[in-house]
Design a protein with these regions (language model features):
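Catalytic-site beta-strand/loop segments enriched in glycine and acidic/polar residues
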Residues: 144-172
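A short, acidic/glycine-rich surface segment
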Residues: 91-92, 137, 193-198
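Soluble, non-transmembrane catalytic domains of enzymes that act on hydrophobic metabolites at membranes
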Residues: 1, 5, 69, 228-234, ...
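A cross-family acyltransferase "interaction/gating" segment
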Residues: 116-118, 161-227
């Protein structure tokens, strides 16, 4: 039964992806011709979020129930901010569609190699942290922040294989410090086998995305980037350890 549910899911998603981006691709070309690159990018980012939400809350319900939970305890962050999430599955990037506001995802090189979606990510201005120097990356981020656009990244860099997160890289935290921005930790629970690393099989179950209390600049201004990444990681790991029943 799980096999046939997976088969149905991939058939529906593949068909929907082709139709969705062909149809809206024509609209985007029209927008790009008669308006600015900025408007075209904003439109594409909005469409990518819509696409992700349809996948998450529509087709994925064949196998998985996804829930977004605000665990911020009133400590919210307005755009722009820096979202950081734990990373345990190839589905993590799609799950970011639950977030409000306009944002750009910070990714490794491999997502850009995915047919159709990779091209859309490039056109939407998503950034590959591996393909540019920190100086260039910082300039791109400052431009996004000036337009009230947040960034989202996975500071582990690679997927963890257990509930214990890997070491964090410092880049996103350097960016937050340079721009005096709030950091919003996101804890994704229940997705490590949706799918497992090296597999396309999605196992049935529940996924929760928790938005933790925002870390204000005043809270970390005296930290180095190294201290800040470890401070943030510790907060996230404590939360994950407290919710192991979901994992």
């Amino acid at each position: 039964m799980i096999f046939f549910k997976n088969l149905l899911f991939f058939i529906l998603v593949s068909t929907f992806t082709i139709i969705f981006f062909l149809f809206f691709g024509i609209i985007l070309i029209f927008i790009r011709v008669f308006s600015s690159k900025t408007i075209a990018q904003k439109t594409l980012r909005f469409l990518i979020v819509c696409y992700g939400r349809i996948i998450i809350f529509g087709f994925a319900r064949i196998l998985v129930k996804v829930k977004f939970i605000d665990s911020s305890e009133g400590k919210q962050a307005l755009d722009p901010c820096v979202y950081v999430a734990n990373h345990s599955s190839a589905s993590d990037a799609f799950l970011m569609g639950v977030l409000p506001g306009e944002f750009v995802q910070i990714v490794n090189l491999w997502p850009f190699k995915i047919p159709i979606l990779g091209l859309c990510a490039r056109l939407a201005g998503y950034l590959s942290i591996r393909s540019m120097s920190f100086v260039d990356f910082s300039k791109e981020c400052k431009l996004l922040f000036s337009n009230n656009i947040s960034i989202i990244g996975f500071p582990e860099g690679t997927r963890s294989v257990s509930s214990q997160m890997g070491k964090f890289h410092s880049t996103l935290f350097r960016i937050a410090k340079e721009n005096n921005l709030k950091i919003v930790p996101l804890c994704i629970l229940g997705n490590k086998d949706k799918p497992l690393r090296g597999s396309l099989k999605i196992n049935p179950g529940n996924i929760e995305i928790h938005k933790l209390p925002a870390i204000d600049y005043n809270e970390y201004e005296h930290f180095s980037s190294f201290e800040l990444k470890n401070y943030t990681r510790a907060k996230m790991q404590i939360f994950i350890d407290q919710h192991k029943e979901v994992i």
